[in-house]
Curated annotation (Swiss-Prot):
Belongs to the N-Me-Phe pilin family. This is Fimbrial protein. The modification N-methylphenylalanine is found at residue 7. InterPro entries: N_methyl_site (IPR012902), Pilin (IPR001082), Pilin-like (IPR045584), T4P/T2SS_Core (IPR050470).
Length: 150
């Protein structure tokens, strides 16, 4: 009697079914992981700008000069030290009023970020008293840890 070589059709079908089940579970989890990491990357891009804004305001630079992502004639990106396209996932916009209140926003670009984040934004809000809060339009499970307010 000859020894069997190779695999039977049923064995191959079972392996294909197992791989299909694993892929059905793994791919959505991977997409969630990507969306969460994009949120963390966006927050890491804009968080250091809080220090830049505070330092500029403390040196007496008018808030209307601390702008990026705008065509305002008073805007001077040298105060911010970052380009609006500093992160390939989207754009950064800084708008601070002369009163000191304003926002630092990261807008996720469609086609550049994952579909779960496309068109959404993370915003750092500053009050005139210098209190910063963070808000996001992302789904709650994708909001980065440093931005706790939904």
């Amino acid at each position: 009697m000859k020894a069997q070589k190779g695999f039977t059709l049923i064995e191959l079908m079972i392996v294909v079914a197992i791989i299909g089940i694993l892929a059905a579970i793994a791919i959505p989890q991977y997409q969630n992981y990507v969306a969460r990491s994009e949120g963390a990357s966006a927050l890491a891009t804009i968080n250091p700008l809080k220090t830049t804004v505070e330092e500029s305001l403390s040196r007496g630079i008018a808030g209307s000069k601390i702008l990026i992502g705008t065509t305002a004639s008073t805007a001077d990106t040298t105060y911010v030290g970052i380009d609006e396209k500093a992160n390939k996932l989207g754009t950064v916009a800084v708008t601070i009023k002369d009163t000191g209140d304003g926002t630092i926003k990261f807008n996720f670009a469609t086609g550049q970020s994952s579909p779960k984040n496309a068109g959404r934004e993370i915003t750092l809000n500053r009050t005139a008293e210098g209190v910063w809060t963070c808000t996001s339009t992302q789904e709650e499970m994708f909001i980065p840890k440093g931005c706790n307010e939904p």
